[in-house]
Amino acid sequence: MDEEWTPRTELGRLVANGEIKTISEALHSKLPLKEYQIVDYLIPDLKDEVINIERAQRMTDSGRRMNYSITAVVGNGNGYVGVGRGKAKEAAPAIKKAIDNAKLNIIEIKRGCGSWECGCGKPHTLPFLVNGKSGSVSVTLKPAPQGVGLAVGDVVKVILRMAGIDDAWGFAAGHTKTTVNYALATFDALKKTVSIKINPKINLSTPIYVGGIGNAGSNKD
């Protein structure tokens, strides 16, 4: 968290003034998230990890110039995760841009025990099957019983771990060696845990958890 953060947006001012106290409140405020410091302020235990580094050389009149393109993921391991990209002429600024953009892209996911083989009721896996796509890559994530672990690719594993998902099955199609699209397709799948609506009249056998585990409860949004 930057020590001398001066909010520049309405959402930032509401957070700094204590009128919005949680990241969940911020994301549901319908105000745009344009300051990464808001996320730092509301999720002090946020972690970040670089998952892809691309280097490209180009020739200029003054010689060869290197450009960096970075993909990073942030999360608190408890229902919140973001993926972002950053570009710069040097690695360090590109990494910072990627992490800051990941914070601006942060989402609140749903978790639960969606595996019929388990039924423990804990938020260890996905609440239901979700699909995501980016470019040529498509990703499918399925709920798994407790103890299975993350039976997914390495890139997906980092993102799910950051989101707070401990068990999942997954498979991908397309050019998964393109790490950026692989990561974005996974992120797109996690967004579906939020966008897919569940009929409130359905009596679920296990609860669905929204965001942090303190928000456990019903299937209603």
Swiss-Prot record:
Xref: InterPro entries: Ribosomal_Su5_D2-typ_SF (IPR020568), Ribosomal_uS5 (IPR000851), Ribosomal_uS5_arc (IPR047866), Ribosomal_uS5_C (IPR005324), Ribosomal_uS5_euk/arc (IPR005711), Ribosomal_uS5_N (IPR013810), Ribosomal_uS5_N_CS (IPR018192), Ribsml_uS5_D2-typ_fold_subgr (IPR014721)
GO cellular component terms listed in the entry, alphabetical order: cytosolic small ribosomal subunit
GO molecular function per UniProt: rRNA binding; structural constituent of ribosome
Keyword field: Ribonucleoprotein, Ribosomal protein, RNA-binding, rRNA-binding
Domain S5 DRBM, residue spans: 46-109
Matching NCBIfam families: PRK04044.1, uS5_euk_arch
Domain notes per entry: The N-terminal domain interacts with the head of the 30S subunit; the C-terminal domain interacts with the body and contacts protein S4. The interaction surface between S4 and S5 is involved in control of translational fidelity.
Assembly and binders: Part of the 30S ribosomal subunit. Contacts protein S4.
Name of the protein this chain belongs to: Small ribosomal subunit protein uS5
